[in-house]
A protein has these predicted regions:
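Conserved coupling/switch loops of ABC nucleotide-binding domains, chiefly the family-specific signature
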Residues: 67, 101, 197
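C-terminal boundary and immediately downstream tail of ABC-type ATPase nucleotide-binding domains
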Residues: 81-105, 193
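ABC ATPase nucleotide-binding domains
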Residues: 1-87
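Non-catalytic connector elements of ABC transporters
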Residues: 97, 108-214
Length: 214
């Protein structure tokens, strides 16, 4: 009714949460059109969601809130590409961005004794020391020449497969764009796209984004 009346202030608190998948998809398009229509100039529309994919699809200005504290504001694309800190990176990705503690030392990124990478040239300006490295599930891939990980969970979602894996204390999630079957404790080799690697400082604040540099 508020939408029909073009109310000046619209507060939509997870309006699609109890709907089936197809109806949610259809109504997301409706709400996205609202952001792009005259309604956006006439009214203030606040859409609350705990679904990061939904927030990104609506493509408006977003406010990332955690435990009542505003962490970052801005256009959805800007926040997604340049999360201010680790918490924002985790909240705005589904599954959450993989965050790996590591050390830069002697032109290497060292996660542990069995997982070391050559420091890419675009990160050569970073000083030696402790950092957190972020990589999305979509930027990890199965690679026979990669590093060994052990499968903890294989989760099929629609036409995609999510592999939850570990190597010693490191835990990551990898997305495969097809249905694949894996068993508990399967050994797989993976690599990461170094051109999509984020770097956060010891306090968890962003210091390098692949979309804008440092």
């Amino acid at each position: 009714r508020s939408l029909a009346k073009k109310a000046k202030i619209l507060l939509l608190d997870e309006p699609l949460v109890n709907l089936d998948y197809k109806l949610r998809e259809d109504l997301r398009d409706v709400f996205k059109n609202l952001f792009d229509s005259d309604l956006s100039t006439e009214s203030i529309l606040i859409y609350a969601s705990t679904d990061p994919q939904e927030a990104m699809q609506l493509n408006g200005d977003i406010v990332v809130i955690d435990e009542g504290r505003v962490l970052q504001t801005g256009p959805a694309k800007e926040v997604f590409e340049n999360p201010a800190n680790i918490k924002v990176a985790e909240i705005t990705n589904d599954p959450a961005m993989n965050i790996l503690p590591g050390i830069i030392d002697d032109k290497e990124i060292i996660f542990n004794e069995d997982f070391k990478l050559n420091l890419p040239s675009h990160l050569s300006h970073l000083d030696s020391g402790k950092y957190f490295f972020g990589v999305r599930a979509t930027d990890l891939k199965l690679d026979n020449s990669g590093f060994n990980f052990t499968v903890d969970i294989s989760e099929i979602s629609g036409s995609e497969t999510f592999l939850h894996m570990h190597q010693d204390e490191l835990k990551v999630v990898l997305m495969i764009e097809e249905v694949r079957n894996f068993n508990l404790d399967d050994q797989v080799k993976i690599s990461m796209d170094m051109n999509r690697l984020y770097v956060f400082d010891a306090n968890g604040d962003l210091i390098f984004s692949p979309y804008r540099g440092n």
